[in-house]
Amino acid sequence: MATLPNPLPKLAADPSGTSLGLELPAGSLIDTTAEGPADEPLLWCAGETARPGAWAALRAARSTGLLPVLLDVDGGHGGPRDWELSPYELSYPGDHDADEVLGELWEAYASEDDEWPGLAEPLTLVADPDARAAEVADSLADGGSWLKDPRLALVPARRSADIPAAIGWIGAANHESDTGLLCAVLRSWEDRFGIRVVALAYDRLVLSVAAPPTTPEEAEEIAAEHFAFCPDNITQGHHGTLHAYAVHEVLDQRVWSFWWD
């Protein structure tokens, strides 16, 4: 996929990131993929569990082309070195249309009687997307979340929505093996709902939401997109219907979490 120049190789000789204007804690560069070592590092990952405030402390990294994300290294499948990252097998998110991607997934998983309703309308931001992402990251790092041992990572990517594809994450492979298609949807959600990719585990994706739906109708429209994106959220979740899922997991929610079996 097309990316900006990768600044991560500079950290091999400068682990603290001083040359990039950063003050990084101890960490490591990861280049492990399912196909063998990558030509350049895919990400930098901190060596210690993330604490509240760690995300905001690396705000300056954005100006270097590095974007933050929390990675769970203790979710039963190890950390990113064990995830069979496959960056060379994925398409570029910008080559796809979110409506077409979701429409095809909807037709594959929804009832034959249910037509794809199309994309929900954009909503009004109630928070700065990057500030909301920092808030959600702090809450995830404060314990009691889906993440067992979250580590702050930095990824060379054009936008937050591209992070999963940029590192070659394939946690949704049982649903859709080309993460580039899913990142096309994330780009659309970034534009319409102010999402940011805040955390990744082996088979889980957590987003912050700066423009959440505030009416049941808006929530149900977005819930349809969630079903196409991740049917397991509904079919294997705590809510047996799309309506119940919309009310409890989408309406007024500042966090969207997706899990694939």
Question: What residue ranges belong to the model's regions?
Answer:
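Short glycine-/aliphatic-rich beta-strand segments at the starts of folded cytosolic domains
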Residues: R158-H175
